[in-house]
Swiss-Prot record:
Signal peptide (from-to): 1-19
Residues under site feature: Required for post-translational maturation and enzyme activity: 263
Known glycosylation sites: 147, 295, 331
GO cellular component: a single term: vacuole
Organism phylogeny: Eukaryota, Viridiplantae, Streptophyta, Embryophyta, Tracheophyta
Function noted in UniProt: Asparagine-specific endopeptidase involved in the processing of vacuolar seed protein precursors into the mature forms.
Active-site residues per Swiss-Prot or TrEMBL entry: 174, 216
GO BP terms, alphabetized: proteolysis involved in protein catabolic process; vacuolar protein processing
Protein name: Vacuolar-processing enzyme
E.C. no: 3.4.22.-
A GO molecular-function annotation: cysteine-type endopeptidase activity
Organism: Vicia sativa (Spring vetch)
Name of a matching Pfam family: Peptidase_C13
Keywords on record: Disulfide bond, Glycoprotein, Hydrolase, Protease, Signal, Thiol protease
Length: 493
């Protein structure tokens, strides 16, 4: 069998596999989650605007680029519109997004971004504070700390908060154990983020801070790292060991409009925003939203466990303190079980964050005319992505076997520490191991983040960098020639 025949066979094997993934779980019972109607149980009487003290600040960050990651920038744009309708001022909302989606040649509605199938444009009016190469971890830290002198490029907008102010941070992208993606430069590491949060607290420049985090293994960003005495409350889309999920994807119920070939949003993000859009947020607490989002986000055989960290006592605060509230929802303080009942759609389908790019490439292939350059390009994209995945998985597995032996290698790389423990003891070691691997094996990319636990366990086992470098060089005799494996964008650490 020739190489072209093998490629074609591999491609259609991939297609069949992922069609099975996409179509699984479509007909689960219970399409809707009906919210309780007991006012006293879930909601309180609204407070007067005059009771609010301080200023609301927000940072909204989409940590990816590429049209296949449409959903992350869509999430951020939606969050911006939600905050503006809630009364937050543009000058107090700082937006980080690569801004390569709205005008992308693949976007079927040029200049428009939507976050749900029948949704309005959420892109119009969104400020471009930090875009393109300006979207990196150091600028995010500088903006959060209010350190204008540390910024590179961008609008110069920072969180210039005072001791009575309330800060809302929302991040959405790919992640892995202990790490969050960034489109430019090194990834954001949990240790660095938590040190920045401690520094912000030490500056005395906020009263409370809420962090909503959408990413795979996002619980690992705060697990064992975020103290409970910083006046910070965080919720995450998943625990420290599992994926988060794309939503409103091709094949979902409901699907995106037929002209779209990508996921429009993410399940956790859609859940908290769609809840916020229909309630008077003066009468709903962070804890109540956490429970509602948690219930919506977990569903077998997919879904994830939404988690909470930090100062759990802050969760009694009203959402209004951080998101404001839309005056149109003033009367939406509770749910009537009959005529006025609110139905939050539970997921009848969702897509693993790490597979959403493959869904996009398959949709491109499926829709492209036979024999067209578009069809050939889509096939190439799938094969390159799968080649990269196979290379990364096999390389990490072989490195584990070289370091720990054939029988114990995989087992030791996959060890999960007890709940409440951070991913790794020495974060500098983790960064060194990542850079060593990428030097010999090419970029981890958004997919390879899943192996961060393996590198952390190599550090936890006390393996020095020299044998790691030798094992990496032996495991990676060659690197696939494709964009995913390229180090053109720099190292991940």
């Amino acid at each position: 069998m020739g190489s072209s025949q093998l490629s074609t066979l591999l491609f259609f094997t991939i297609v069949v596999t992922f069609l099975t993934v996409v179509s699984s779980g479509r007909d689960l019972p219970g399409d809707y989650l009906r919210l309780p109607s007991e006012t006293s149980r879930f909601f309180r009487e609204p407070k007067n605007d005059d009771d609010f003290e301080g200023t609301r600040w927000a940072i909204l960050l989409a940590g990816s680029n590429g049209y296949w990651n449409y959903r992350h920038q869509s999430d951020v744009c939606h969050a911006y519109q939600l905050l503006r309708k809630g009364g937050s001022k543009e000058e107090n909302i700082i937006v980080f997004m690569y801004d390569d989606i709205a005008s992308n040649e693949e976007n079927p509605r040029p200049g428009v971004i939507i976050n749900k199938p029948d949704g309005d444009d959420v892109y119009a009016g969104v400020p471009k504070d930090y875009t393109g190469a300006e979207v990196h971890a150091d600028n995010f830290y500088a903006a959060l700390l209010g350190n204008k002198s540390a910024l590179t490029g961008g609008s110069g907008k920072v969180v210039d908060s005072g001791p009575n102010d309330h800060i809302f941070v929302y991040y959405t992208d790919h992640g892995g154990p202990g790490v969050l993606g960034m489109p430019v430069g090194p990834y954001l590491y949990a240790s660095d983020l938590n040190e920045v949060l401690k520094k912000k607290h030490a500056s005395g420049t906020y009263k409370s801070l809420v962090f909503y985090l959408e990413a795979c293994e996002s619980g690992s960003i705060f697990e064992g790292l975020l103290p409970d005495d910083l006046n910070i409350y965080a919720t995450t889309a998943s625990n420290a060991e599992e994926s988060s999920w794309g939503y409103y994807c091709p094949g979902d119920k409901p699907p995106p409009p037929p002209e779209y070939s990508t996921c429009l949003g993410d399940l956790y993000s859609i859940a908290w925003m769609e809840d916020s859009e229909v309630h008077n947020l003066q009468t709903e607490s962070l804890q109540q939203q956490y429970k509602l989002v948690k219930n919506r986000t977990i569903s077998e055989p997919y879904g994830s466990h939404v988690m909470e960290y930090g100062d759990i006592g802050l969760s009694k605060n009203d959402l209004y303190q951080y998101l404001g509230t839309n005056p149109a929802n003033d009367n939406n303080s509770f749910v009537d079980e009959t005529e006025n009942s609110l139905k939050l759609r539970t997921p009848s389908a969702a897509v693993n964050q790490r597979d959403a790019d493959l869904i996009h490439f398959w949709e491109k292939f499926r829709k492209a005319p036979e024999g067209s350059s578009q069809k050939n390009e889509a096939e190439k994209q799938v094969l390159e992505a799968m080649s990269h995945r196979k290379h990364i998985d096999n390389s990490v597995k072989l490195i584990g076997q070289l370091l720990f032996g054939i029988e114990k290698g995989t087992e030791l790389l996959d060890v999960v520490r007890p709940a409440g423990s951070p991913l790794v003891d020495n974060w500098d070691c983790l960064k060194t191991m990542v850079k060593t691997f990428e030097t010999h094996c090419g970029s981890l990319s958004q997919y390879g983040m899943k192996h961060m636990r393996s590198f952390a366990n190599i550090c936890n086992a006390g393996i020095p960098n020299e044998p790691m470098a030798e094992a990496s060089a032996q495991a990676c005799a060659s690197i696939p020639a494709n964009p995913w494996s390229s180090l053109q964008g720099g190292f991940s650490a």
